[in-house]
Amino acid sequence: MLNDGTGFKKVYIATGFTDLRRVIDGLARIIRFQFQLDPYDKNTLFLFCGRRTDRIKGLLWEGDGFLLLYKRIENGSFSWPRTKDEALEIT
C-alpha cells in the first residue's frame, strides 16, 4: 500500500490521451514499449489521463507488486499536458 506519497524518486506524466480502460498490464506495456521505460522501477510513479480530464490513473511498482491508483474529481478537471511541449519536468 502507498505509505508515503513524498517518497517518489521520479514521476512521469504520459502526455496526450490514454485509454483508461487499461489496467495494470496494459499500462505497463505502454510504459515499456511506447516510452522505453521500466515499469518495475521502484518508487517511480507513472501518471495517465484519458479524454475526460476529470480522472487520472497512476501505476507504481512497490517492490512486491503494482499499485494502481485512480482519481476522479467531482468538480473541475485536471490541467493535463496533451503534447510534450506542454509538459514540465518536476524535480
Language-model regions, residue ranges each:
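Polybasic/polar functional segments that serve as interface/processing modules
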Residues: 1-91
